């Protein structure tokens, strides 16, 4: 199993090219099941979860071809299997997103209950309840979701009990081929949901209101393939910006979208960073300045993203002052705190809040990645810690960050992938 070996690196400097968004690419790839003709997707990151999604589509009989560094072509002409098996689904929670497309186009789907990061329950009931309102018959049996519909799904007025990105995406895809109008209230507003909606519209879907809390979908008879480019990864962007702030550096993120990161950029400015943006780039300058402590509360978009919480734990660990970070989206999402404490961070947990007292320096240590974003926080900590940091179990990192060690090296970071 690979590890990352990280040495204190000084101030990061230079340009980093941001990859396509994993959390947009995964549902967009699943949407390929809805298309009757070839579907071409570009700016697809080369990640473990993306590879798992492609393998899942192949398992169903679709032809999936990767070309260049970022292109995927999907053909469903020979799709003839409707079961997403445990062996694939167990490694990636987003596999549940195949449920809506299979059911909408083929009327049948068997999907193993999903896996992914162990950061809380994240139940699938909202997905199932919405599909049942659209006429699906669903039972959960022997670890599988077994869904059937006679004829086409029917449009429905769905009010979601809580905001769920995955459920919004699943219902959006299912409703695109349903009979009649579907209204989703209390829908997730994340940019990745909007990106999926824009992709579906390019395929011929009729969708209004994506990016608001009420989305209207008028079902159509069929969807066709198209050429679509995945949005930039806002969480990767934010992670590099935090790394630059923590190391007191100056970097520019290109192929980025500042409009999707307003809450994160505001907190970085509160921490003392100078931020400059263009249409597709963000520059952060923290040269010669120690970050100031910033209080964080994670909330659904457009609020502060839960996927940036761990990175700001590191920033606050080295900041001037004391800060609190409150996690409201997922339970059990402070698993990085004990690992950062091993590096000398002064942190204490009180329920869903972490109280962080900033100190001058961290010390290198052997630490263990517990989930995707926690692993990114440990890498950032290693860049600024005195001595050597070894991050174990970086397969979590490979699920969501493309060539992270190479990108940090390009900014002057001393990061090396080593075999166990």
UniProtKB/Swiss-Prot annotation:
GO terms for biological process: cell division; cell wall organization; peptidoglycan biosynthetic process; regulation of cell shape; UDP-N-acetylgalactosamine biosynthetic process. Its main location: cytoplasm. PANTHER family: UDP-N-ACETYLGLUCOSAMINE 1-CARBOXYVINYLTRANSFERASE (PTHR43783:SF1). GO terms for cellular component: cytoplasm. It is found in: Cytoplasm. It catalyses: phosphoenolpyruvate + UDP-N-acetyl-alpha-D-glucosamine = UDP-N-acetyl-3-O-(1-carboxyvinyl)-alpha-D-glucosamine + phosphate. NCBIfam families: murA, PRK09369.1. The modification 2-(S-cysteinyl)pyruvic acid O-phosphothioketal is found at residue 117. Its EC number is 2.5.1.7. Keywords: Cell cycle, Cell division, Cell shape, Cell wall biogenesis/degradation, Cytoplasm, Peptidoglycan synthesis, Pyruvate, Transferase. Cell wall formation. Adds enolpyruvyl to UDP-N-acetylglucosamine. Pathway: Cell wall biogenesis; peptidoglycan biosynthesis. CDD domains: UdpNAET. UDP-N-acetyl-alpha-D-glucosamine binds at residues 93, 307, 329. The keyword Cell wall biogenesis/degradation applies. Belongs to the EPSP synthase family. MurA subfamily. The keyword NAD does not apply. Phosphoenolpyruvate binds at residues 22-23. It comes from the Bacteria. This is UDP-N-acetylglucosamine 1-carboxyvinyltransferase. InterPro entries: Enolpyruvate_Tfrase_dom, Enolpyruvate_Tfrase_sf, MurA_subfamily, RNA3'P_cycl/enolpyr_Trfase_a/b, UDP_GlcNAc_COvinyl_MurA.
